[in-house]
Amino acid sequence: SANKVDGLSYTLSSRVHNEKVVKRTESYIYYTEEGKLKKSNVYKLDAPYNVHIDTTHAQIANVEVVVEPKDNHSFYFKIENRGGSLYNFSKDSIIRNADLNLPKVARYNQWIEGKDYKLMVTKTQIPYSESKFSFRLVQLKEATGRATQNFSVTNASKIASIISVSKNAESLNEAVDLLNNSVQVLIENELSER
């Protein structure tokens, strides 16, 4: 029915629902690729590494960090502008301005911890190229806003139980991953309410 489609549309585009999707997909980490001619946003599935943060630990947000490979087991962190915001992830709030002071060299698959950060970098199957890849942590509300952009739910046919969900994003992998996880979160929520 139209009410069911309206209800699903509201749920799928709500901040609460999309915040769950963002947390599940770790979409609060933005990645960029900088080549010789341009700098572009890329999704984690298109990056040569993924960053995982400990969401129970204070983190410094809004600092761009370049990760360059050193060898198969370690990498370099390079930061041009250390000034960011100390961020409480669980409360989605900024505590104060702070500088990010990461070690110059770190190892893949190991927690890297300091007073204002706790993160891990894992290698993916995507090889490093001549491009520079960087990441930055953003606040949940910014990541949730990006997840809800260009998202639509419509009645796909006259059959009331079929809906069409679409999402445009920076990359196809981002759109597919966010859509799949959005539907999965919806299914889990529907099942838990029964």
Give the residues covered by each predicted segment:
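Extracytoplasmic
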Residues: S1-K158, Q184
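Structural beta->alpha junctions
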Residues: A156-N173
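A short, surface-exposed, charged and often Trp/Pro-enriched helix-loop connector in the C-terminal portion
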Residues: I162, V183-R194
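Solvent-exposed, non-transmembrane alpha-helical starts
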Residues: V176-D177
